[in-house]
């Protein structure tokens, strides 16, 4: 070691936050950090900032004009190919939205996460740091009226339109986040472009939708750089399918995107410096500084591939399909040594991006040829070749779906270019077209609910089962629509219980009786009635425990139909394990309590909200199969803090019931008599130090009143997670039911 070399790494910096941390000592520790993200502490905007209002005050078409002008305003520090940045901005928007996956709804462009690591430093995102910097003067001009999340997508739309393509529309409304989202599982590989972990069992690991660490979809050279278009098609079908795209949408997206621009592989990637998150401070957040000749323009290195697909790379055309089928293709390599294909025996006629005197032969990627040599893709490709209007429509729709899949329901769509057509992947619910129930109706309906012959615990469990399908990642699920009565939700194992079908039948009967009795157009939806049943049942449970509470309720939900429900798509919301209902068990890789934290994060819960909900759900006997797991009370159905009192009782000793370590028996320390049974999702609130600290608040002698108040608040939050109609219109005037 030289005299000037430091023997310490920055990880061991002797300042606050340095040195070994808990995750270093205990890497398997429960990841509660994902429940503490994106809060007001990290947000620099004013408290109460309303992005929807800000966006709607924007000079939207002025912004679009500025973006269109930028497309051809080539900058010396990063020159535009063919004098037009369109291809670059299409790629930027695609790679922002394209991280979405259907299994957990995470990823996507809805939070502007491409600005942060790891996405800003993925190998597949080389040079997109430059695209975002090109946008900065426009973002600076319009400030908080346009989020980065919206701007990245809108720039892609304007790029398409500026090159002659008619888009399907655009919806704003994506609010920015201000830190990297730590909840997303991007894979277990420790090397960029690795895939040894995600294919450990022979198939792509769930919930991943990319074939390699750091790629958006697949390796364009072919699987593990095997330039076989047929094998590549298998990877394409899996990855695009996991991003919610069918074969037609997949073909349209690949061909449509590759109608424009070019790839960049002027030299080997060894010439590139560190990625943005690892680069020197002097680069100010830019990365991949190139040492290859000028490093820009014709010398740019991005993917290592060097392909220009069409003769008019800044104009919409059908040339991609024309060339795909017109020419025979032979394998070659780019200047960087990457596998790609060139048209055999064809005189060069493709323009050079910077020198009009130079021409190139047509070239394609391995994954482009998949659209010709995969039998199913070929049928679609030939149809698009022969019917350019069908291709244009399919690409417009697929691009809109790609860029809006994680925005949420249509009520969140903002701006003057929102398309009027309702699409099934938007999980539509009928518009509210009738007067809603008032306070007197609520009081009447609550009495009918509690006198229905169904226990209040079953009614509350029904409401929880409906509302808790929500996931904040892509804003799907929730109580609105009452889809719990429809396929596929009614057939999920967690919902295939007699008490649920009986509760729904009773509520449907009450709904019919009420609606039939009206002399006006006033109606109550089943979706509203399910949530109202939860409120009425919760008030009764609290009252039976000696607490007089009022549970807030806002009517206005409507009932979706089976025709408005994509069964295959909704099946992605079915839980593998759900600790809130003591359903399912962990695996050697994902423990039961890990599944619980994952579910809590999708419900936008904080650690205290998670804790209080578990305590209340257990004493209300919310277990899906009505087992006694975690029901630490002698008075089930009453809203008490008994779960915490008995969990923290040092007179109880816990031991595994068997060698699975999933079920535990709590016995009296002195007599050995069994008192309770618990799952891992129960005992974690006594074993994990941070969760135990919260549990102690609720388990104290003065904790029950706070517990009841906090449980009611947490339920109100969960039951309204999907009420974006209230949040967007400012009509969140909750009707307080009469006591």
From Swiss-Prot:
GO molecular function: catalase activity; heme binding; metal ion binding
EC number: 1.11.1.21
Catalytic residues in the record: 95 (proton acceptor)
Domain of life: Eukaryota
A Pfam family annotated for this UniProt entry: peroxidase
Main EC class the enzyme belongs to: oxidoreductase
Positions contributing to heme b binding: 258
Residue(s) at site: Transition state stabilizer: 91
The entry's keywords: Cytoplasm, Heme, Hydrogen peroxide, Iron, Metal-binding, Oxidoreductase, Peroxidase
Induction: Induced by transcription factor stuA upon carbon starvation and during early sexual development.
GO cellular component, one term: cytoplasm
Region (Disordered): 1-20
Quaternary structure note: Homodimer or homotetramer.
Family in the record: Belongs to the peroxidase family. Peroxidase/catalase subfamily.
Function statement: Bifunctional enzyme with both catalase and broad-spectrum peroxidase activity.
HAMAP family registered for this protein in UniProt: Catal_peroxid
Protein name: Catalase-peroxidase
Native source species: Emericella nidulans (strain FGSC A4 / ATCC 38163 / CBS 112.46 / NRRL 194 / M139) (Aspergillus nidulans)
